Amino acid sequence: MYKKSEIEIEVLPANEGDCILITIEKEDIYILIDGGTAETYRNYLKTRLIQLRNEGKEIDLLIVTHIDNDHIGGIIELLKENGSDMDSKIIRIKNIWHNSYRHLQFDKNQTLGKSEKNILNKIIANGEVSLNYNVGKSSPISAIQGTTLAGLIFEGYYHWNEQSEGQAIINNGINYQFGKECFISVLKPNISDLEKLGKKWKIDLKKSKYSFVFSEDKLFDDAFEYYCRCMLTDGNGNNEKICYSNHNTEEMTIEEISREPMSEDNSITNRSSISVIIRYRNKKLLFLADNIADDVLEYLSQEDRGYSLVKLPHHGSANNISDDFVERIESDTYLVSTNSEKYNHPDIETLAKIACKRTEYVKRIYFNYKIDKVADFEKKIYGMNDIEFVYLGEGQKIYL
């Protein structure tokens, strides 16, 4: 939290989501990872981006990790107001990384028929109804208006996945260079992840029509996005598939909590989210989106054990992190982005795993909201010399 070097991390209030701005000062590089909800954009992100624009700055890279309302809602609002790459009203965005329908790994060279169009239009219409119902319960003014992220990127002529020549952003062993000394490598997704996501999409569509044909028509992009945004919800916008920790930890020791068994997250969209390592000089930052930590481990070499910062996957869900990951990864700075209100993240089991790892250095876990159950758990770690919780106030940053 105290300025000591050349990287700044701003974790904007994003309710249950992510909106993270990374600044590499010496090279004037700005990286935005996700945009939280529409409310995040209106209340925080827009003001910050206009401030950067007025200082003559640009966003060098916008990473939209996956199609989920608490990650893309703010980006949709930003791109609506921003206009186009050639005439940016809010701020110039030089590159966007985002995997959409067009990046799924299967043939799409057929001709779209009338019945397929009707089915896709129904998916879009049902998606708008479902999302408006869900959003309206928490923020009545942020109604979904039928605009998709993929459509806005395409119609705004933004540089979309340009580093991979317009193809999917995947783990391909390449270190993408930004500026002189900043390099970004992709850990997830891999081709298999996108194939599985595409397979599920095809199976579900063929339930409506067995011989469903697939094309490059924009209608597919829009329908796929609504499909992913509603994949975790029922018709009323209620979450069906996220597993919650429901252990009563009040009378348990930290060690007992850390050993509580959890079910691994089986969400295909989460496993397809973009996780990256950002390297600058001697620093490495690990951003795990909503991925599963063990899926990432297989891509990390022994040299990749130490990190200046680890953004915990899926807002600190115990279903996305394991003992093996905590033991293998060395870091003194962890980050959790959530207000805990919708999905009850972070899980106390995750915090206990990190607290129970004995280190000669102090491990700091940063939160962008004060959360009651985290404060209660903090009482359990009182007196431990190698763990500290830090609550970021509005405008406060992490300095690395």
Which residue stretches match the model-derived regions?
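Long, well-ordered mid-to-C-terminal structural blocks that present hydrophobic/aromatic surfaces
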Residues: 260-320
